[in-house]
């Protein structure tokens, strides 16, 4: 599939020491069919040829753009923001021109080499057209009502269209999960499921104004909570199935495996990670969420420079095995860190004075966690005669790489290497963008240009890419064999900030993988797919680690802490700030031993006691206690909630507490009031039963014990 901007090759920086070559003339050269091609011709054909990915950048940009837009509107957005979000999504998923849904289908079909059946394709496209048309009508009605919220007619129209559209999503979602074709349909399912959940959220935001009853609003809310789990589990299951089906043994199979992993993360899993944050009862104000997962762009190596000479493609040139490449490229689960410096060591591949390639042979990476100590890792050859090149990246986001995949031929033995890389970066806190480049020199070799933005495009078009970039470089891996040196870049999402800043007027979600250290006994483990990154685990009591947080004033602002966790045991969570204890509470098991982590095994719980930060920068610590070794306790993230935020669950708890207290006399807390009847106690019991397990499980148990005591007193009195 051709790139839309294939002929718009952006040049390397002006300080480059390489002669510019016309990309148009090169394109013409590569289209010429040559007979009896020789050594020099093969090199000439591949010179500055642009490597085409499976899909245009605009297709991936759709997934990146939608996730990025939603990240900016989490919580309960203003009515105008909701309408604007629908307008954006309609433009992305139902644009004029070629059907975006077909492009999604074709992309996955090509990666996994599986065609969707004609019936399933046509059924899905027909249902998607209907949903798009209905969503556009609802969007127009919503905008009309937002412009005149007191208009009875506008309110009635948007309400009826909302109910009809929501039911339509319920009916049509199964068309995107056809048995046997779940994997190629997965991006479509994820986007449609995401829209359904956003739509269900509207009932909680606007339902009261539209005239929906409390029970109707509750029905939509409960459906949203239930479907969020169902949709999440479906996406993770079929992502994992598709990925495992692509696992192979050689380098070529790794290429498609990695492409599926990257693109399905961008188009599916990033959306799934946001589903819990659509809950308006949990997130009634602006909410900041972060994606900490890593994705990997294609290896920098020549690909098909000539069809009759297959070994000139890096993965056919005696490249390492699938498992060796994974080990070289994908780090073990680790705390989120940021790249600070790269030192590059070069090797020389030489045929003659006019044909040679100085290429990337090894490197030393320096990186650190947020507020942590410097870490160093090395790969490849680091003891070479060529002077190393050191590139500083402290406090800089590398948002784009332009790399040359080089090919040097020794008679019939190709050598694959990387003779040049341009790292485009910007300072995090200043509007200054520039680049550093690695270029030790080469001559007479074949090269192909690989631009990271073809695989990780910016979130939006129409802005400079140093403003709208979606990812930052986090790590570099090296695939190394006797005749292959291929780089693989690792990237994190821009939403994972460098500062762990807590805002006074919004809910701040901080994944625990952003801690700056790990306590003894704690481990980072692979995320289950729906958390947006890796998670932390303990199997015995102790602290997980420390998070360095920065506080935006006012410092008088008070917060409550919430924890998203999963556990095979009842336990206590303890929190502290700068070593001073803040909260301690009992919480219950969410899963059984041996059970897989899925959406329902995670629960978000909170402490009721508020606190303030006294310093601009503080260290927050969380630990798990009072459980037997051998159990498993996982934490996804910590949430800091301004205390002014009131919750329906909190109101219900206070009301239930008052009703329970009212059963007893004021002079004797153990004495039942004389006018309390059996049905009074039953009413209070039902009220306690309706309390949220998520927030007040232990308090609920305590109130039940008091109600039972009241029941016992009533029975004894009647006897």
Swiss-Prot record:
Keywords in alphabetical order: Sporulation, Toxin, Virulence
Single GO biological process annotation from the record: sporulation resulting in formation of a cellular spore
InterPro entries the record matches: Galactose-bd-like_sf, Pest_crys, Pest_crys_dom-III, Pest_crys_dom_I, Pest_crys_N_sf, Pest_cryst_cen_dom_sf, Pest_cryst_dom_II
SUPFAM superfamilies membership: delta-Endotoxin (insectocide), middle domain, delta-Endotoxin (insectocide), N-terminal domain, Galactose-binding domain-like
Pfam family, one: Endotoxin_M
GO molecular function: signaling receptor binding; toxin activity
Superkingdom classification of source: Bacteria
Protein task: Promotes colloidosmotic lysis by binding to the midgut epithelial cells of certain coleopteran and lepidopteran species. Active on Plutella xylostella and Bombyx mori.
Family: Belongs to the delta endotoxin family.
PANTHER family: ENDOTOXIN_N DOMAIN-CONTAINING PROTEIN-RELATED, PESTICIDAL CRYSTAL PROTEIN N-TERMINAL DOMAIN-CONTAINING PROTEIN
Note: Toxic segment of the protein is located in the N-terminus.
UniProt-recorded name of the protein: Pesticidal crystal protein Cry1Ia
